[in-house]
């Protein structure tokens, strides 16, 4: 009546209470876990690379001009624009002509960008002459006569379009 099993009886436990690992089942689980971890690392790395590629700056291209914003009159009755980008032509004019501001309603701010990248800003009023405005722009940025005439026609169209709204 021996209570201790004999080594040849076919039990799965080794002496000392350890499991018999010779069948490879646990090794298969460990290999599977390692392979899964490696795959997860590769997927995360690929996602990071894709995110980096997506956030790189695109090649520079000309930006759309800002939308024209309605600026209400001040309570004191003055019509000074609060937009510093659109400066009045009388202040920045270097031609020496000190024409007073037309008393008409301000329609829009014309910004002409030359080929060199210089921007000329002129405020166009309701009573302005398109020829005078195109001359003022060409005083800051030399224009060919055909370009000056095309600018004059475009200013006429814009004034007519905005006057029909008012």
UniProtKB/Swiss-Prot annotation:
Region Disordered, annotated ranges: 36-108
Domain of life: Eukaryota
Pfam families in the cross-refs: UPF0561
Positions with biased composition (Basic and acidic residues): 36-49
Family of the protein in this entry: Belongs to the UPF0561 family.
Name recorded for this polypeptide: UPF0561 protein C2orf68 homolog
